[in-house]
Amino acid sequence: MGSAESREGRRASFGMDEEERVRVLQGIRLSENVVNRMKEPGQPSRVGLLAPPAAALGPSGGREKDSKPPRPDCGSGRGPPRVQVDPLERCDWEQAVLQDELVRVATTEREAAASPRSVTLRRGEGGVDQEKQRLAQRARELESQEEELRCRDAFYKEQLGRLERQNLEAYRLSSQQFHEAATKIEGAIKPRRVEPVCSGLQAQILRCYRDRLQEVLLCADLVRAYQHCVSSAHKG
């Protein structure tokens, strides 16, 4: 379980519970005792000589005779003899290391996942501030445009009133001048008395025609006298 062959031949798979604790390792759910031991810092590893179990020697004792004890390398100067770690302790140690690595990876992932949100929030706040500034600037521009329109409206109203007053004054002056000129011309023209020409002869001719309807030729002398009178009036 803790040997190099086991580590190279099997891959560790893990799962985390709601408290972010590793509970599954290589398909095996960890117990509370193992988790507690993984949490304890600085736990000394129990190292001792690993004696082969009695079952591994077999029923016959011939192998004990053939097997030779290992010779210590006293003269080599390479240090103390090699010791073998208890597989259970080695498994616990590997699980503790794996637990620390998983916690570190989970923490790193949480920080990496949280940093874009914080950056996005800061960017969002900056965007909101920029939008507020843009709206405030637009409001000031609209207020300035409205003020300019009010000034122009007042100016045009004043100019229109001035033009109306000028036109009214010009109309009154023109009307007064017209009446004065008409009165002056009427005074300069002399009236003439018109009387009908040869009115007496005209009345006699009309009476003659009424009295002598059947003898109108008898009125010829009066007609000639009326024509002579009219011709004289034209000449005179």
UniProtKB/Swiss-Prot annotation:
Alphabetical list of PROSITE patterns matching this protein: CHCH
Residues where Phosphoserine is found: S13, S31
UniProtKB keywords: Coiled coil, Disulfide bond, Lipoprotein, Membrane, Mitochondrion, Mitochondrion inner membrane, Myristate, Phosphoprotein
GO cellular component: MICOS complex; mitochondrial inner membrane; mitochondrion
Basic and acidic residues: bias regions: 1-11, 62-71, 122-132
Motif (Cx9C motif 1): 198-208
Membrane topology, record value: Lipid-anchor
Binding partners and assembly: Component of the mitochondrial contact site and cristae organizing system (MICOS) complex, composed of at least MICOS10/MIC10, CHCHD3/MIC19, CHCHD6/MIC25, APOOL/MIC27, IMMT/MIC60, APOO/MIC23/MIC26 and MICOS13/MIC13. This complex was also known under the names MINOS or MitOS complex. The MICOS complex associates with mitochondrial outer membrane proteins SAMM50, MTX1 and MTX2 (together described as components of the mitochondrial outer membrane sorting assembly machinery (SAM) complex) and DNAJC11, mitochondrial inner membrane protein TMEM11 and with HSPA9.
Protein name according to UniProt: MICOS complex subunit MIC25
Species per Swiss-Prot/TrEMBL record: Bos taurus (Bovine)
Name of the gene this protein is made from: CHCHD6
